[in-house]
Amino acid sequence: ILGYKAPKLISYSYVLLDGDKMSTSAGTVVLVTDFMKAVKNTLINEFNKRNSEISVDKLNILVNACIKFTMLNVSKNKIVNFNLENATSFVGESGMYILYSLVRINSILKNNNIELTEEIKFNNEIENKLVKELSLFPEVIDELLTSNEPAHLTKYIFGIAGLFSKFYEQVNISNEVDVVLKSSRIRLLKSTAKVLTNALS
């Protein structure tokens, strides 16, 4: 129609909420509005624990992100068991963990806005691992398009976020006196942010 290709439907298995099936006869049906409200309230509690504030608009975006990531992170041939606590956690294999990693990267870049050198060098193994993993992004996208398995992408970006977490623990950027090394690390974080942003788009 109108020159556009018809979208390809990818069917998924059942979705369980914390391991339970929904049943009208048993009165266990959960409305979408109630489900999203539960996710929102859980996120609010998470932010309150951290004494952090968030706007309503951003909160709604995070609600959708938590649900989407959790659903897509399961193979289409498997039952999706939606665990509210895991889906909204800032740690572990969740959308919030990925987004938190991206926020942290952008914060580092904002605080280290320097002129970058042409020369590139690294001196830490975790840097090389991150470079190698980032280079696989085009292959992951090709595999996703071939297999119609979004979980390939979610698993990949979770791995990227995990490598960044190790990078964050082992590597210092702000206090680095070697200009070339500092510049190289900033370039690496910019590339990491770009891959994560594109993958989440």
Predicted feature residues:
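Non-catalytic interaction-recognition regions
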Residues: I1-S201
